[in-house]
Amino acid sequence: MNSLLIMGYTSFDLGIFNEKDIKVSIIKKTIRRKLINFLEEGLRWIIFTGNLGFEYWALEVAKELQTDYDFQIGTIFSFETHGQNWNESNQVKLAAFKQVDFVKYAFETYESPSQFRQYNDFILENTEGAFVFYDEENETKLKYMVEKMKQNTNYEVYLLDFEDLQETFEEMNE
């Protein structure tokens, strides 16, 4: 696989409001293991959409892995105004999404709901698969994007769920 889209729950979805929460270290350890597998299979691009939570933690891990693996990181934002109203600590995270190998904005500003569909279609057409932290038993708006991914038989979808995190937690405590 050449390009992998990263998506998943936000920190709000997960009830994580502090980066020092033990759940963050469990999630990041799981991300590291999964990304290393993808990279060792030849992954060349990791693509983000610029969301907080899972995506941001995956971005941190990916940037660390760039010292040992040869791959590129890109962020494709929906709008140039993405995150402009975030608080100061989240602005730092937004800046991290912009300090990657490739940054693109699908649209300048929001004009209509159809832009979200066009944006989703664009990122799916320009990636070969996705690594998504999503558990079908804990639905969020991600449900629709995951369904859209699964409709395309040529699109690889790798789901990370709460069971995977439980396994990581148990390994950490052995």
UniProtKB/Swiss-Prot annotation:
InterPro entries: YspA
Family matches, as HAMAP family: UPF0398
Pfam families: YpsA
Signal peptide per UniProt: none
The protein's name in its UniProt record: UPF0398 protein YfdB
Domain of life: Bacteria
Family (UniProt): Belongs to the UPF0398 family.
